[in-house]
Amino acid sequence: MSQVAYLPVGKREQTKVQNRQAILDAAREVFGELGYEACTVRDIIRRTGLAAGTFYNYYRSKDEVYVALSDEGARRFTPLLKAQRAQSADWSSFVRAAIEAYFGFLADEHKSWLARRPVDEPIPHVHGETPEMTAVFNEVRQAIVDEIARGGAPGADPDYLAAACIAIAREVGEKMVARRPIDTKAAADFVVALIEGGVKGLPKSPV
């Protein structure tokens, strides 16, 4: 079961957190068993044991539930990314450590519910920016800015480079979990080589 990142005060707030977590846990199971496209909100509600009205107090659609699950994943990954940045001596070591941590995280998530789905089933993309996604982006961007400041990375545009690194890792990660067996090392080697090689050819830009 996933972890809740905060502790509420008061019985009412405790109930809200428990209901929200029950919906997310049920959705994770239903998405894994039936597939995102095939399942309905009713399938999720039945699994929670909550009333339909209670569900709609928190989410309006299965799309919103999927976004919430994505947010939860990003929230849990952000501390891992911070730890990698703190432990890395330079830009290259950070890229390697961050990509390996991300792909390991994806592989673990895959075991929880994606592994029960057909390998060729499309995974829905989350559109729009959430606070958790922004936190991941900002952590990558700050790592790039820090490395530029101490001369460990070329003076590339940090916003563009952070966005490119995240996009590459996300897209390759989707392909990685669709393969059998899942090879996190091969995927990480490919992405690191692509990022490092691409950075070398970038024009320098002041921060």
Regions found by a protein language model. Name each.
Residues 113-118, 156, 206-207:
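Short, hydrophobic secondary-structure boundary micro-motifs
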Residues 1-18, 155, 203-207:
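N-terminal intrinsically disordered/low-complexity leader segments
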Residues 15-27, 44, 65, 69-77, ...:
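Generic hydrophobic, amphipathic alpha-helix propensity
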Residues 68, 82-110, 161, 165, ...:
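Hydrophobic alpha-helical connector segments
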Residues 75-78, 124-152, 159-163, 186-189:
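Amphipathic alpha-helical packing segments from all-alpha helical-bundle domains
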Residues 1, 101-105, 155-175, 186-198:
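Hydrophobic alpha-helical segments that form the core
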Residues 22, 30-64, 68:
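Helix-turn-helix
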Residues 103-127, 142-145, 174-178:
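Amphipathic alpha-helical segments used for helix-helix packing
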